[in-house]
């Protein structure tokens, strides 16, 4: 069993003394840094490697901080110009994950790189912190590697902005499996609908 397997097992138990201390110290450190900054190496190497990262030229890791909470509707003077049922401004829930937002912001910052994947590293009461794995499509080490050079095709430009990464597909309700396409209006809503008994009031 390799060393990263032990790291993975330690990381699984987030309530353990070791990880709680490590997360608390790292969270303080991340708060002092810029909202988007490049990391010299992944802080979770086991997770990064599972998502496709390789410690070689052409692979880059960026850390990003995203503010937690719902999305407030941008309505000047509270005017939404619609029916009263759609007048909401404050308690609206964004339909994409914060991780997707993180990927999109990093993708805009590093427009010449391609977003491969991302993962959670930390959170506090105000922010969530993610690491985003990016690939340089111009680098020879990437273009010559048959396992990753698919990302060099122009069709994969800004895949994070079009919901083509793992987290983007999740919020779009796209997955594999028999009749998965029947998950109308979200997987949680589908589960609730299929596990709730409803009766006529007068029966």
Curated annotation (Swiss-Prot):
NCBIfam families: PRK04243.1. InterPro entries: Rbsml_eL15_core_dom_sf, Ribosomal_eL15, Ribosomal_eL15_CS, Ribosomal_uL23/eL15/eS24_sf. Belongs to the eukaryotic ribosomal protein eL15 family. Keywords: Ribonucleoprotein, Ribosomal protein. One of its GO terms (molecular function) is RNA binding. This is Large ribosomal subunit protein eL15. Residues 193-203 have a biased composition (Polar residues). GO terms for cellular component: cytosolic large ribosomal subunit. Residues 169-192 have a biased composition (Basic residues). The keyword rRNA-binding does not apply. The gene is rpl15. It comes from Aspergillus niger. Residues 166-203 are annotated as: Disordered. Signal peptide: none annotated. GO terms for biological process: cytoplasmic translation.
